[in-house]
């Protein structure tokens, strides 16, 4: 059982996933710092608040902190955009080689012609 576990852990996909999770966590902290320390103060200058996350509205005895939600939305948008750009960059570096439909048809046609020629010889 230990050998199976070792083989499972050392497979490329599992290691890639582990590295991705670790880098993702570090990147999330970086984006959070960017939003909290640079973007929020800029927005705060326009909404007369020290931090976007502290914006709230009180209805009755209930306090709705919509600023915290907006803060998380900004974090998500920045993270998603950077991941999108990263994936586009990686796809350009390592393009998938896909045969076009025309190439596939040409190969099929060549094979059929070879079969036809062999049948004619018989």
From Swiss-Prot:
Q: Per its UniProt entry, which superkingdom is the organism in?
A: Bacteria
Keyword Oxidoreductase: yes or no?
no
State if Iron is listed as a keyword.
Answer: no
UniProtKB keywords:
Cell membrane, Ion channel, Ion transport, Membrane, Transmembrane, Transmembrane helix, Transport
Membrane-crossing ranges are 14-34, 67-87
Name the PROSITE patterns on file. Answer: MSCL
Assigned GO CC terms = plasma membrane
What topology does the record note for this protein and the membrane?
Multi-pass membrane protein
Q: Which InterPro entries match?
A: Mechanosensitive_channel_CS (IPR019823), MS_channel (IPR001185), MSC/AndL (IPR037673), MscL_channel (IPR036019)
Q: Name one Pfam family in it.
A: MscL
Just give the chief location class: membrane
User: Where found, per UniProt?
Assistant: Cell membrane
A GO molecular function term, named singly, is:
mechanosensitive monoatomic ion channel activity
Q: Which NCBIfam families match?
A: mscL, PRK00567.1-3
Write out the similarity annotation: Belongs to the MscL family.
The free-text function statement in the UniProt record for this protein reads: Channel that opens in response to stretch forces in the membrane lipid bilayer. May participate in the regulation of osmotic pressure changes within the cell.
Q: Which PANTHER family match?
A: LARGE-CONDUCTANCE MECHANOSENSITIVE CHANNEL (PTHR30266:SF2), MECHANOSENSITIVE CHANNEL MSCL (PTHR30266)
The annotated subunit structure for this chain is:
Homopentamer.
What protein is this chain from?
Large-conductance mechanosensitive channel
**Taxonomic source organism:** Lactococcus lactis subsp. lactis (strain IL1403)
């Amino acid at each position: 059982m230990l050998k199976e576990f070792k083989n499972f852990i050392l497979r490329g996909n599992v290691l890639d996933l582990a590295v991705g999770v670790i880098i993702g966590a570090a990147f999330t902290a970086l984006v959070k710092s960017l939003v909290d320390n640079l973007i929020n103060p800029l927005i705060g200058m326009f909404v007369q608040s020290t931090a976007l996350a502290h914006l709230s509205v009180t209805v009755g005895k209930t306090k709705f902190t919509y600023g915290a939600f907006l803060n998380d939305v900004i974090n998500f948008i920045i993270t998603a955009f950077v991941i999108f750009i990263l994936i586009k960059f990686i796809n350009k570096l390592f393009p998938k080689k896909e045969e076009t439909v025309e190439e596939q048809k040409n190969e099929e046609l060549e094979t059929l012609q070879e079969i036809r020629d062999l049948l004619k010889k018989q």
